[in-house]
Amino acid sequence: MSLLSDLINLNLSDTTEKVIAEYIWIGGSGMDLRSKARTLPGPVSDPSELPKWNYDGSSTGQAPGEDSEAIYTHKPFQDPFRRGNNILVICDAYTPAGEPIPTNKRHAAAKVFSHPDVVAEVPWYGIEQEYTLLQKDIQWPLGWPVGGFPGPQGPYYCGVGADKAFGRDIVDAHYKACIYAGINISGINGEVMPGQWEFQVGPSVGISAGDEIWAARYILERITEIAGVVVSFDPKPIPGDWNGAGAHTNYSTKSMREDGGYEVIKAAIDKLGKKHKEHIAAYGEGNERRLTGRHETADINTFLWGVANRGASVRVGRDTEKAGKGYFEDRRPASNMDPYVVTSMIADTTILWKP
């Protein structure tokens, strides 16, 4: 095993300028990540230098199989697994004719974020990505007794100790790997349900928020693969008196961050309320199991906002209210949401939509 480890950790720059690029794209379910690697002649300083590639969409549930789907490169990150000059590359997928395939949500998001009115507002996002670690063979949360349940919620949120925190080595490895990769990860914490954790990405501007969340999810999938643990983004992995898993999305525009921004925030929240059903429909599959009005959520059928209210659909922080400017938190997105969809939809509703 030591020889295998030595070979995995070879520093290619000792003998060659060649680098390995791992191309990452989203599969047919809209949540499954796929990737494959190719050799490049040397380090890449700009995404435009990365060649387009292709893949068999019939094997990812994305095409009938007569032709190969194309993947276009967008955002490179440093590869924390191969290290050196090797990179991970976030891509999106197209038909051979150049049309975005149905699971390519980045293409439409990029159109929203390139709109001059949106560009002028410099939208910031901070996404709180929750997830649950599962024992591989039984698909049951890490640290839970087989076929049984731990003690009730209370001691696990930000908890410390072998009977409260399960999988911290995975969480910390992921945290450091994201920083190494160049992802703007801003923190981690243990969540209310044991075996559940959260990482935060942001503040990130526009389309980069989606790129960074998907890259962070990919790195987490790779680390749990190594650890022999399954990561679940199900919004309610365990029924009953247990917290679900969300992806609270913090948001601000230039106008909100400036003096008088609180009025802009309230106007934006009013718009979100008027499009509540449309947003809920796009905020993650199975979210109705999570948004019940219990466990720090609002009821899925009701739009409610408030200051410092964790049971609201949209929450405004006390600091924002006091300063008269800042940001707000959309608490509705599920943990399995597509960040391209959620971020662009919030921008579209609050900036571009005219009721």
Swiss-Prot record:
Ligase among keywords: yes
Record field: catalytic activity: L-glutamate + NH4(+) + ATP = L-glutamine + ADP + phosphate + H(+)
Transmembrane segments: none
Domain of life of the source: Eukaryota
Residue intervals of the GS beta-grasp domain: 19-98
Major localization class: cytoplasm
Subcellular localization, as worded in the UniProt entry: Cytoplasm
Residue span(s) of domain GS catalytic: 105-355
Signal peptide: none
GO cellular component: cytoplasm
Region of interest called Disordered, as start-end residue ranges on this chain: 39-67
GO terms classed as biological process: glutamine biosynthetic process
Gene Ontology molecular function terms on file: ATP binding; glutamine synthetase activity
InterPro entries, per the entry: Gln_synt_N, Gln_synt_N_sf, Gln_synth/guanido_kin_cat_dom, Gln_synth_cat_dom, Gln_synth_gly_rich_site, Gln_synth_N_conserv_site, Glutamine_Synthetase
Keywords: ATP-binding, Cytoplasm, Ligase, Nitrogen fixation, Nucleotide-binding
SUPFAM superfamilies in the cross-refs: Glutamine synthetase, N-terminal domain, Glutamine synthetase/guanido kinase
EC number annotated for this UniProt entry: 6.3.1.2
PROSITE patterns, per the entry: GLNA_1 (PS00180), GLNA_ATP (PS00181), GS_BETA_GRASP (PS51986), GS_CATALYTIC (PS51987)
Quaternary context: Homooctamer.
Further details from the record: Irreversibly inhibited by the herbicide L-phosphinothricin (PPT).
Family named by the database record: Belongs to the glutamine synthetase family.
Protein name per UniProt: Glutamine synthetase cytosolic isozyme 1
UniProt organism field: Glycine max
